[in-house]
């Protein structure tokens, strides 16, 4: 959650409401963020901090020495059910609560290695085996884990190492026969079996060469931009007194071209929307799975084999290297504040991490620099009086506006270069004047509470790039913050307000499927929140000409359509014309970003407000024509005699149907496939009686039927249902949309598994064409499509194949 937990938010808003009017006016009319921060922090009382401390204790982020056994036993249950992914996550939770170099930690690592082995994650399994041995895996259990190590090595084709491992195991067994009841002959037999298995897989290995595994790190911008870091030379930076900074095309741009490839200046993993559990006797430890269990807290890489922080049970990493980097850069300060940071929300957490990454000295320098350039009144609003005439960076001299630049573009250095650095971050707009007084008060008290905790710790853990006078950092704890902490607090308050408009949701595609299904469904989930100074220069459009994707902490902006030279490069902030109507979009953009959208999509829709989108339309029960009207709907066909019907009645029917579809989706998730099919077929019949053929719910029902039929192995019916869903997706999102790409990916899976080779190859090509516009060749789905295509092309010709 971006803002604090509801209890703390409500508490502070009540505190604001109870303040004398004169105090509210003082804060509301404060001219600088420094004044807002100092006025607000003076109102933070010990009882407020005590209440916040109680809330923070709801998050169990410390290590509980009784937890490893609990999680190991819960993991064993999942393992016996053959839910190896679920087992691995629970073993990871056990690892997070274990102390280093203990039997608890070694057993959790060893058990997790078994789950990873069954998932085919052999390299990762070997790492866990080494970790288990490093942390003191019991001698009595060594044969079991050594055999697993040999099996991994054979599966990876490292037969010489496997033979050496077996020899070591046999030698140990001979020396100490009481270690285990595993015979050397059994080990040799297993080794021989695995060698044969590797030989059989040789051809398959050649079919999927390593060259297919393209990553975003391999993707390069066509030509680096000299004035705009992380951007292509096809992109130019401009500024206008009315619209501010924005990006334009300096040359014609083709669909799919990579325009920006930027690493987040700072990012924080989103803990998810799950509230802290109520810690009773029956639920002392949390078994729920969140993003924090599946992704590295530093680089955001997906992993089932997390390495925990030695000091807390919350922070987890994909490797020892990420753990060490995080500790040195920021986590040594954040570690003891884990529960507090989760209570205060992601924005406050990012504000702290940002200042920790930069270092106290550099934060103070840039604030001092701003103070020297402009009046103290504008210390936190450098953009307020810096109105700049139009300037185009990246366009030729003859194409510049000819206007004289009065001041540099905010965020650029003295040479006019805009880079991914703290100067650029600091110059992102906080929109202080647009935020409500109570919101600024809430943010200021959150930062104040955090500063009090940092001050209480005497800043002993705060990393700085240069030595700082110890007397400045180790001031005694007093109700009034010392001047240095005030600078820190003002910077964090500015960043909290900036994040309201400049935070970038870092998303990933998560694949899900019903039990037993080999055809996956996908959904976009918010993984983390970050700040990208260059990406933040993009203005919004409800019908943008770019798409954004993420790999790890890197954002990639690609052209989703042809962009002409001089045309503005636009990004969607969330409200997209294919997902919501113009009124809802306008409201969301106004409340979060403080502007009224006037993009072509909004202007077009504003002129035809009466016509509702086809994916929300009702149809006539008699003739099937679309219904028209506002509160009372009539059949759109003049020849139809069907009587009018109220919109409320149809909306009520729609809500009932949505509930029934929800029941079917749960049956599908639980693996009750036959019941799910019957439920969905009933929903489909009901939908046909009052919903337009391209209604979104009609597509959702068809998609559910396709997944259920695929799980049952009925590929022909699955393809038929999914093609109906495709028509709905195409009408709503367009034939080249990323949504269309995801749906075509599913259809390709169905044709592939149904052995319909021509249909599969044709669909794979269409899916690749759509996805490459939005995701790039590093995307998991694109790489899976390439593997399917490679497999199909290598098949020998067959005269007859199963029909789909």
Swiss-Prot record:
PROSITE patterns: SET, ZF_MYND_1, ZF_MYND_2. Zn(2+) 1 binds at residues 296, 299, 318, 322. Keywords: Cytoplasm, Metal-binding, Methyltransferase, Nucleus, S-adenosyl-L-methionine, Transferase, Zinc, Zinc-finger. GO terms for biological process: heart development; methylation. It catalyses: L-lysyl-[protein] + S-adenosyl-L-methionine = N(6)-methyl-L-lysyl-[protein] + S-adenosyl-L-homocysteine + H(+). Zn(2+) 2 binds at residues 309, 312, 331, 335. Residues 233-574 form the SET domain. S-adenosyl-L-methionine binds at residues 112-114, 427, 539-540, 573, 595. The keyword Zinc-finger applies. One of its GO terms (molecular function) is histone deacetylase binding. It is found in: Nucleus; Cytoplasm. A zinc finger (MYND-type) spans 296-335. It holds the Pfam family zf-MYND. GO terms for cellular component: cytoplasm; nucleus. CDD domains: SET_SMYD4. The keyword Ligase does not apply. Its EC number is 2.1.1.-. Protein-lysine N-methyltransferase. Monomethylates PRMT5, modulating its transcriptional activity. May also act as a histone methyltransferase. Plays a critical role in cardiac development. Acts as a key epigenetic regulator of gene expression during cardiac development via its dual activities as a methyltransferase and negative regulator of HDAC1. Interacts (via MYND-type zinc finger) with HDAC1. This is Protein-lysine N-methyltransferase SMYD4. It comes from Pongo abelii.
